[in-house]
Amino acid sequence: MMGRDHALSGALVFAALATTLHVNDAHLAAGVALCAGAGVLPDIDHQDTSISSSFGFLTEGFSRLVALLSGGHRHGTHSIFGIAVFTVGSYFAGAYQLSGPKVTGIGHPAFSWHLVPAVLLMSLLYSAALRALHVGGHHGDLLGIGGALLTCYTGADLTRLPVGSWHVPMLAIAVALGCAAHIAGDELTHGGCPIFWPASMHEFHLLPRPLQFTTAKLCETWIVFPLLVVGLGLAVWHDAGHPLVLPSSPGQHAASGP
């Protein structure tokens, strides 16, 4: 699939699950944007993609390294193993709430080196989403950095959302959902994905061959893209009609005191 449609699919998945995740409106906006960026994250294994060109030679060099380690495009990063690596990395990047300092009485994080991994990752995701959607032009990188800093200030990336009996940083959830949406999208195409890499290189598909489509051809342009736009619009409309309540994590209860 094209980067634009990968970004839309990531945004759609987070918006569709927003009421289940119990996020408020501010966190919904951040989550949708982060998940849109994560929707193109697996393509960091290819140099000619929106995410690989987000920050010039820095991301291009990193892309070459990822491609070398993962076996090339649509291999390691397009597998269950790849989703796990991205998710674990983003979990630790977003988990600085556990030890990062707070501004007394405000609840926003004070400046700390704990912020750096999350700021870097969110800058990459925001910038990649903007590039994939052809928004922001040459200023997409600066907008991505600004968005990451704003997200940190509002504490959106600090939010721990309930997943079963766990409370997981929203950044990790957005990355996991976005990567999963990306792989599912590629499994609709003729190329498929080796989801059990490195144990197996067999390419899996979600549709029978007659229903599979080719990237950037008529089916994706005139059917898949409009469906994603309509689906995202309906999901956001649905979220707007339902109160989105952000639950407090056990740590937040303890910090608030009696």
Where are these regions (language model features)?
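N-terminal membrane-targeting hydrophobic helices
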Residues: M1-P258
